[in-house]
UniProtKB/Swiss-Prot annotation:
Keywords of this entry: Cell membrane, Membrane, Transmembrane, Transmembrane helix
Induction: Expression is sigma Y-dependent. Induced upon nitrogen starvation.
Cytoplasm among keywords: no
Protein name in UniProt: Uncharacterized protein YxlC
Protein origin, superkingdom: Bacteria
Spans through the membrane: 46-68, 73-92
Membrane topology classification: Multi-pass membrane protein
A GO-annotated cellular component: plasma membrane
Subcellular location per the Swiss-Prot or TrEMBL entry: Cell membrane
Chief location bin: membrane
Amino acid sequence: MNKEKLSDHLKSEWKKIDQTANPSIPNQKELLHQLSQMKAEYRKKLLQEIILFVFCALMVVSAAILAFTQAPAVFIVLQVCVLAVLPILIAAEKKRHLGECEVKRG
């Protein structure tokens, strides 16, 4: 009999939880709005990455041309600097990638 009371008590508590934790289901308009916001954020991030890539590519090409034509020592210093910064960039990219994998609620 003790198990039956416990079972009934748990069932009643579960019903209370179900009643209080009733999630709201968004309508089609809200879903479309959320989707358009996510697409806009994606486009903005993509554009930022493309601009950053082009800027970095131009800087690298300019520095390489300068190093090859003006001073080979500058080219060697540039290579050392890149090797020093590369682990930091890799760590930042891994951290950013892990942050994107987490589930965002809001």
